[in-house]
Amino acid sequence: MDNKIVENIIPSQPPIESQSDAHVLKSRLEWGEPALTILDVRDRQVHNQGHITGAMPMPLNELVDRATATIAKSRDIYVYGSNDEETAQAAQLLRNAGFEHVSELRGGLAAWKAIGGATEGVVEAKVPPSAG
């Protein structure tokens, strides 16, 4: 059997874009075994109040050092901050540090919540499930 036929049958994720909307990230997470990392570069206290489920807190001032120590440079990374400007700054810092696949999550946590993305945190835990 021709290997090209097999390659065309087995679906694969498209390459990561430099900017993504919340739907793209949600689709990746629903894919099954996503080989990706979500970084929340907001202040840790804000992160603890509520964040995308599974997002790692890495405040902007610690971002490069912590990411370099814990994440492979080839891993797909989705990053979000308090606003799109902070997100873009964080993404550029990561790219400058040698991370190859970094995507800015446009709209951040608000966009994620708007599409019903899963969240966790102190404030999130206080909201009854029926309140959504």
Predicted features by range, described:
Residues 1-49, 121-132:
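Flexible, polar/low-complexity N-terminal or interdomain linker segments that lie immediately upstream
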Residues 29-30, 36, 61-79:
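Mobile, glycine- and charge-enriched loop segments
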Residues 38, 55-57, 102-104:
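Conserved beta-strand scaffold positions in the cores of enzyme catalytic domains, especially
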Residues 47-53, 112:
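Short loop/helix-cap segments at secondary-structure boundaries that form the rim of catalytic
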Residues 50, 69-70, 115-118:
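Residue-level signal for well-ordered alpha-helical positions
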Residues 56, 74, 119-123:
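Short, hinge-like loop/turn segments at secondary-structure boundaries
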Residues 68-113:
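Catalytic cysteine-centered active loop of the rhodanese-like fold, especially the PTP/DSP P-loop
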Residues 104-132:
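A generic hydrophobic-segment detector
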